[in-house]
Amino acid sequence: MVRQAKGDGKAHTVQDSIPFRNIFPDGLCRLDGGDFSKTIAYEDVNYRLAGPEDQRSIFESLCDFYNGYDPTIGVQMTLSSRYVEHGPEEDLFGIRPQGDDLDPIRKDAAGILRFQYERGSNGYVKTKYVTLTIEAENLAAARARFARIETDTLNRFKVMGAAAHVLDGKERLELLHGILHPEGGRFAFDWDWLAPSGLSVKDFIAPSSFHFGETRTFRIGEMYGAVSFLQITAPEIHDRILSEFMETEGNILVTMHIRGINQNEAIKMVKRKITDLDAMKIAEQKRAVRSGYDMDILPSDLATYGGAAKTILQDLQSRNERMFNLTFLVMHMAATKQKLEIAVSQAASVAQTYNCLLTRLDFQQEDGLMSSLPLGLNRIKIERSLTTSALAVFVPFVTQELFMGGESMYYGLNALSNNLILLDRKQSRCPNGLVFGTPGSGKSMSCKREITFIILTTKDNVIICDPEDEYSPLVKRLGGQVIRLSPSSTDYVNPLDINLNYSDEENPLALKSDFVLSFCELIMGSKTGLEAIEKTVIDRAVQKIYQPYFADPRPENMPILGDLMEALLAQGIPEADRVAQALDLYVNGSLNFFNHRTTVDIRNRLVCFDIKGLGKNLKKPGMLIVQDAVWNTVTINRAIGRSTWYFVDEFHLLLKEEQTAAYSAEIWKRFRKWGGVPTGATQNPKDLLSSPEIENILENSDFIYMLNQAAGDRKILAERLGISAEQLAYVTNSEPGHGLLFFNNVILPFADDFPKDTELYKLLTTKPSEVEHAAETET
């Protein structure tokens, strides 16, 4: 039978139990009485692996954070770890069957991501919030005061390096819905629905039922829950206690209600405590004299408490310390009572490790649940007074996460949190990338993995410069085009290919002429470069040989090196003859491999230039020609709005020669504007420090994937990227596929261990024994 509400002050519906009056579109929440609250979400920062100085800086900033709130502002810190049910792996990672030959690879890739996802802790979404509560006469007064408080709070998070934003009304409702629906369920809400339906915002977040019939547990729908409080009995608290609570299994919500005490009242309170302790000390001394004992022998607790109280008084009077009251709550949710007890026991073990006690609330489970909601309401009056420094030891930071939306791709697991690292490099200010690692550390495999996911999850083009013929099996399996450049090959690429979009200037010949100058300089082998007259005759010849093509842009009108040589000879001056004679070896001589029109399809989405077969004399111009072919493709794709990824293995080979190094620096400088995403893989970072021009490649790379590093290279990376000694441990004698990721100034340790019993792993691996075994299996 439904009981009617008769003004008895009790909650008669689930909605009545949720302790707020209303939430407004701007995120302002009206509580009972004259209290109002707002919630701010903030991101994690790299604390655990930061150096001692950086950790100290974060700690001091956290002290300033708490000191910035006067006693009229309530502060509620909320740390949530909640399991979110996902659909099939293709829904989560965007890898869907297409009904073609790549579906087995797609299934492998999706399965591997699902394996890594479940192996890590990504089923659990970890979020952090601070809810601020004030008292105000009305909505207008509350909004006016919160305007200043929000700005100050966001600035304090910025100082700590944590991104933060104020939740609007819908975001707050979604947050509450997630907590009140621990079994999952989609949140659907729109402000326009309220008036026609006659419903309140509570109707969109309320669970099916609350049950508070038991003394130490409660139920939300079919889920079981329990709220405990932390008894801080340890003389000192470790800064990892919060993070270890959040690393326990199961749905957990850690709440810290913090309220500052007026400084004068705090000092008076401590002085009264000292006076009481002194009175107890005098009483003990009198008792000792009467009993014939030494009056200096006092109970140890009395001496300890007296010294601690005087230290606190000194901190309050002469240091930047304030006093706060803290209520520390831990709420668990589980599908069964047994799972709930296991989760609570795990958290209790963490508390015991740090000499604290996690005690279940008796007969206060409803108040505990409502106090755990990020509303800024605290009904549990179990408080512990702490100074600013003691409070700030509860550091809410562990490690930053990289879990982006859009066309994000997998780059391993965060070695600290076990969460997937999903990035969309194209969202970066500068998506250029570098991969560093000693031989056998996994450089090529990491590039292959990224290439695979680009092909499977985007519509972008990929071009590979492959000096060691390591990528051909993967490229063929993914339906790509392998172009073998060697004197014995019939795969020809014309170095003089051009398209009308070759430059963003009106005249595309300007940039093409620059390439031809670099090519001629390379084959002439002059240490001092081309002379001014030589540059003039080359440019004059370039202008002439492209006239037929621009007049009638058909493939058969595209010039080749032989046409360039003839145009030089036709000028009849010694400087032109000298350049023509240098070209003769590449036109009529034994190195005439590049004196042909292009015979291969470089319009395929995936193209691999295999340059292993180019001899010593052809490899240098060959690498330059590949770079120019890449530029051609990038300009074509830019016109149709498609990105082009360019992977260069053994990148140091390009950096050795002045011409290819200069061309590489130009690519790293200009590719972003043209929709290009270059990535260079090499062993040693010092290869990029040989000149200021090459050094710009490192400066212009916001994605750096660091595998195992030699000692000298570790030092270079630490200085250049600001890597701490603790972080460097992840690139010191690390296993293959393990290291550090630098992305947009975020540095994360990662682990990328692929299951080996898959077709995809066999395509990615570069270990000789595994490659041979895969080849034998295919035959």
Tell what function each PLM region has.
Residues 435:
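Hydrophobic anchor at the beta1->P-loop junction of P-loop NTPases
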Residues 483-488, 703-712:
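Conserved AAA+ ATPase "SRH/arginine-finger" region at the nucleotide-binding site
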Residues 441-494:
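Walker A/P-loop NTP-binding active-site region of P-loop NTPases
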Residues 682:
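H-loop/switch region of ABC-family ATPase nucleotide-binding domains
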Residues 1-399:
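Extended, folded cores of ATP/NTP-driven motor/assembly subunits in large transport
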Residues 721-777:
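Conserved P-loop NTPase
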Residues 45, 52-71, 78, 82, ...:
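P-loop NTPase motor domains
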Residues 438:
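P-loop (Walker A) phosphate-binding loop of NTP-binding proteins
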